[in-house]
Amino acid sequence: MAEEKKRRPRRSKANLIECINNAAEEQIKKDGFSNILVTDIIKRAKIEPVVFYKRYHNLETFLSEFVKNYDYWFSDVLKDLKSPVTSKEGMTEIFQRLIVELNKDSVMLELLRWEVAIGNSTTSRTAMLREIHIMPLVKDFEVLFHDKNVDIAALTALIIGGVYYLSLHKDRSPFSGIDINTPEGMCRIQKAIQYFVKKIYEENKLHDDRKLIAYRLKEAGVSENVIEQCVWGRK
């Protein structure tokens, strides 16, 4: 009598979902969101097709659920900072940590790539949710730099956008002669972030110093016109 085929141990619903998600994560890191196939996920997860389709109507439905695991990704970058978020050191650490995390060939990097390449309900939602999660931080910085001649929202957009592009471009060619795949290249970008943030905060302090000088000159009886010209450089 032929031996009965050994059955695989029955897995719980939570375990199956975890297996499917882990398989998708590995496949996405390898091929990206645009090239992923259900058959690849099934093969990696070592499940039957019926198990996948019992839970997800199609690949689009699965990906819509899967990317929700990354809705709070930017918020996670802000966790356990060594310095207050709105301090010079805090801002520096946020942007430096951002490029380090993206440089790990993460699913998040592939999600950014997918958002740029493909417009659909899922990519629109993930991009908008990230914007919503970033805005409280931007608002905190805007309060700090209020009336300081510094458009901090625009400056942080340039830094974050630059970090995103450098990360997305890193496997195509160096950028401005800098290869962030190398320790030397990454170090140069980290130092540039530190320098850029330092200048932003120096401008903030300079504005406060000028206000104090203007106030003292006014108290000393110096005319408004002279103060405007000498302190603020206005004609």
PLM regions and their residue ranges:
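N-terminal intrinsically disordered/low-complexity leader segments
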Residues: M1-A14, H207, G221
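Generic hydrophobic, amphipathic alpha-helix propensity
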Residues: K13-E25, I41, F66-Y70, F74
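Helix-turn-helix
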Residues: C19, Q27-T61, E65
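Hydrophobic alpha-helical connector segments
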Residues: E65, K79-K104, M108, D147-T156
